[in-house]
Swiss-Prot record:
It is an enzyme of class 2 (transferase). One of its GO terms (molecular function) is glycosyltransferase activity. Coiled coil: none annotated. This is Amylovoran biosynthesis glycosyltransferase AmsB. SUPFAM superfamilies: Nucleotide-diphospho-sugar transferases. Belongs to the glycosyltransferase 2 family. Pathway: Glycan metabolism; exopolysaccharide biosynthesis. Keywords: Exopolysaccharide synthesis, Glycosyltransferase, Transferase, Virulence. Its EC number is 2.4.-.-. The keyword Transferase applies. Involved in the biosynthesis of amylovoran, which functions as a virulence factor. May function as a glycosyl transferase which transfers galactose from UDP-galactose to a lipid-linked amylovoran-subunit precursor. The keyword Glycosyltransferase applies. It comes from Erwinia amylovora.
Length: 301
């Protein structure tokens, strides 16, 4: 089998400081056949980013830095990276996340196995360590997508999660699917849902191969996480969603947006209306987690 190459696509926005640990993790990768495409999204610190990228510290990396003169947002920046990719496979990595040193090696091993058994259209993802405000929170997803479960149900429910910095797919497949540049939020949901509809197989590596950093000190508006945006996105996605997919979003995701907007009553009503219309696995997982929380509060353990 040929020596498979990867293109790592990194969208960057005011990321000249956070990208240092991101590039450090690429320096440490055990598998070396990859190039890096950084697309800066018209940042105020673009020149500082250029200085970081061109420093001796990263002289061993093959980096193509693109300084966009127009605002692209995350979807557009990733699409620009896809267009410039030359590797056999495209990997996405956010400019404030990190990979485990064997991330590419483990993906390579899985790719060789999948290709060896005749699989042609697949998307690889892995578990991630979720770091909230600098502290470890949890590992997600809890399990891979179910055999009879849509990717939308999986992503919208309680146990599923496909973080962008773990996604790996063939370059030609990335070029076919692309990110929808209308969306400032949920671009990763959209890409995965449309890939599912096209018949792509989703394969999870049951090991956290990335650190995903969440910051909660900002309000919900700062990344388009408002109820208004969520309803716009859900309506735009309806051609790709089943009725139960929509119910699952309104039971588990939309209540979180209501809470972030300070609308606790609407959150409770949305959950109550749609919870029993979601699949059994999501209902059982939610109830199990609820019981665990109650037990912890009662026992202090």
């Amino acid at each position: 089998m040929k020596d498979i190459s990867f293109s790592v696509v990194i969208p960057a926005y005011n990321a000249s400081e956070s990208i240092i640990t991101t590039l450090d993790c690429l320096n440490e990768q055990s598998y070396k056949n990859f190039d890096v495409i950084i697309v800066d999204d018209k940042s105020a610190d673009a020149q500082k980013l250029a200085e970081v990228v061109s420093s001796e510290r990263y002289s061993g990396l093959k980096i193509n830095l693109v300084l966009s003169e127009t605002k692209l947002n995350g979807a557009g920046a990733r699409n620009r990276g896809i267009d410039l990719a030359t590797g056999d496979y495209v990997c996405f990595l956010d400019a404030d996340d990190e990979w485990h040193k064997d991330k590419l090696q483990q993906n390579l091993s899985l790719i060789e196995r999948l290709e060896g058994q005749g699989d042609r259209r697949f998307i690889i993802y892995s578990q991630v360590n979720i770091i909230q405000d600098g502290s470890f929170l949890k590992v997600m997803p809890l399990k891979p997508v179910g055999e009879h479960e849509s990717i939308a149900e999986y992503l919208f429910g309680c146990y599923g999660f496909i973080q962008t910095s773990t996604i790996v797919l063939k370059r030609e497949d990335a070029a076919e699917i692309r990110f929808d540049e209308r969306y400032i939020r949920h671009q990763d949901y959209d890409l995965c849902i449309r890939a599912d509809k096209l018949g792509f197989k989703f394969v999870m590596i049951a090991q956290p191969l990335a650190n995903y950093h969440m910051v909660t000190r900002f309000g919900s508006q700062h990344k388009g996480e408002s109820v208004k945006y969520s309803l716009f996105w859900l309506d735009a996605m309806k051609p790709h969603l089943t009725r139960r997919d929509v119910y699952t979003y309104k039971a588990y995701k939309l209540p979180l947006r209501y809470k972030m907007d300070g609308k606790s009553l609407q959150a409770s009503l949305s959950f109550a209306r749609y919870f029993f219309l979601t699949n059994k696995d999501n209902r059982n997982d939610f109830l199990k987690r609820l019981m665990n929380k109650l037990r912890t509060r009662l026992t202090g353990k």
